[in-house]
Amino acid sequence: MGTEADRDGAMKQPGLGLRLAVLSRGPRLYSTRRIVEEAKKRGVDVEVCDPMKFSLVVNQGSVDVLHRGRAFAKDAVIPRIGHSITQHGVAVLRHIEQLGVWTANTGQGILQSRDKLNASQILARNRIPVPKTVYVRDILDVEHAIETVGGLP
């Protein structure tokens, strides 16, 4: 399979037939734009889909996903879910996962990464070095927590 040069002289991959969705509220964000640019450069059919524009359908024996009222027919998803819509974005992503669509990050992975204490626990349990961390809720425990980690930075 050869490549062809686009109008900028960059080499372009032949069409792969892959239908990709980038879940993002911000199609103009740099990170989203770059993903789209690179996908197009490789001949991927890519669309930015706003996670807030999905309808999730659960019926006896099936789940369906609609984006802006139309069937969501993609082969892969790259989620770019902002912190402010984590719960909804993860609900959409999990629903898409139920359809067997490949996702670059799972809903569970996104939730675990947003919970910094849980993320540290997972890393430590898998023998990946993490800074010594103490989690407290009561202000009376803060001084002891600071001592436990060896003082303030």
Residue ranges of model-derived segments:
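N-terminal ordered "arm"
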Residues: 42-48
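N-terminal glycine-rich "phosphate-gripper" loop used for MgATP/nucleotide binding
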Residues: 51-97, 104-113
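Active-site nucleotide/adenylate-binding loops and adjacent lid/helix of ATP-dependent enzymes
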Residues: 10-25, 29-37, 46, 66-72, ...
